[in-house]
Amino acid sequence: VRNFVTCRINRGFCVPIRCPGHRRQIGTCLGPQIKCCR
């Protein structure tokens, strides 16, 4: 997962920090500093 669209398709969401709670990172959204979490 490397962008906002594929993040959303994979039921993820983009955060500028590390993933909250028990969510795990499945990729990035806009470069490595924006994480795609699910």
From Swiss-Prot:
Q: Which InterPro entries does the record cross-reference, listed alphabetically?
A: Beta/alpha-defensin_C, Defensin_beta-like
Give the Gene Ontology MF terms in alphabetical order: CCR6 chemokine receptor binding; chemoattractant activity
SUPFAM superfamilies according to UniProt = Defensin-like
> Which cysteines form disulfides?
7-36, 14-29, 19-37
On whether Secreted is a keyword of this UniProt record, the answer is yes
Q: What Pfam families does this protein's entry cite?
A: Defensin_beta
Arranged from A to Z, the UniProt key words for this protein are: Antibiotic, Antimicrobial, Defensin, Disulfide bond, Secreted
Protein location: Secreted
**Tissue and organ expression note:** Neutrophilic granules.
For this record, the Gene Ontology CC terms, alphabetical, are: extracellular space
| Superkingdom field | Eukaryota
Q: Which family does it belong to?
A: Belongs to the beta-defensin family.
Biological role: Has bactericidal activity. Active against E.coli ML35 and S.aureus 502A.
Q: What is this protein called?
A: Beta-defensin 8
Q: What organism does this protein naturally occur in?
A: Bos taurus (Bovine)
Classification of source organism? Eukaryota, Metazoa, Chordata, Craniata, Vertebrata
Encoding gene per record: DEFB8
